[in-house]
Amino acid sequence: MAQKVEAQGGKGANLWDDGSTHDAVTKIQLAAGIDGIQYVQFDYVKNGQPEQAPLRGTKGRVLPADPFVINHPDEHLVSVEGWYSPEGIIQGIKFISNKKTSDVIGSDEGTHFTLQVKDKKIIGFHGSAGGNLNSLGAYFAPLTTTTPLTPAKQLTAFGSDDGTVWDDGAYVGVKKVYVGQAQDGISAVKFVYDKSPEEVTGEEHGKSTLLGFEEFVLDYPSEYITAVDGTYDKIFGSDGSVITMLRFKTNKQTSPPFGLEAGTVFELKEEGHKIVGFHGRADVLLHKIGVHVRPLSN
């Protein structure tokens, strides 16, 4: 249950409320005019999907300030400072995240107020507005979620039993994929995971070549990996097989193939689930790959 902190500022104009069911605030846009803050507009993420609230106030001809972007899930909005005039108009606002502080947009004159709750983050706003922004309040939620993740399920890996076993484990989600290639197949893989609120870069599995890594970046958190398909094949001078091609499918797109399609085709997928981790076997090449999955409700 979110905690509502009452709006500060004037009492007039039209009441508005963005709601208290968002996961986080991701972007703030606003503009200051002669009389004070002319408008404000908030972007949120809710159940992994971006959501933009209506503009509060009036746009007019004033130039907007640079947007204050919050890099969710690693960054969250901690507090808001503001100032309002005797006429009940917000004169200036400053936003503070766990990583940075905005400049004061507008003026720091008038009655000062702060919207902040210890050990909580802002997930929504409410207030009042007419020709200007008259008041501003916020909804706060605990920094750590109280809803535990559903236990992950490990899917069987494909490939050969050459090399050494590796396992990154299961996380909240996958943010980036790195794939290295060699003459005989995939030389190495590396993944960047969301371990809210931190980002974790997994170890390199295999051995990268002078060609380095190719990168596949997801539009996280609204984009997630639903399946991985690929091929594995025996190579000259080895009894085992090597992963020769990998391709990553998300809820929004399919990556280009990394490597050359040759040998036995496989697919790693569980209906209604997303991939949240990887495991397999490797030495100087990638010999085997499997995944950890969680239900999409997570």
Curated annotation (Swiss-Prot):
N-acetylalanine modification, residue list: 2
Mutant phenotype after disruption: Reduced tissue damage-mediated BGLU23/PYK10 activation. Larger PYK10 complexes.
Residues annotated as domain Jacalin-type lectin: 2-142, 152-295
Gene: PBP1
The keyword Secreted is assigned to this record: no
Protein name per Swiss-Prot or TrEMBL: PYK10-binding protein 1
CDD domains linked: Jacalin (cd09612)
Phylogenetic lineage: Eukaryota, Viridiplantae, Streptophyta, Embryophyta, Tracheophyta
Record InterPro entries: Jacalin-like_lectin_dom, Jacalin-like_lectin_dom_plant, Jacalin-like_lectin_dom_sf
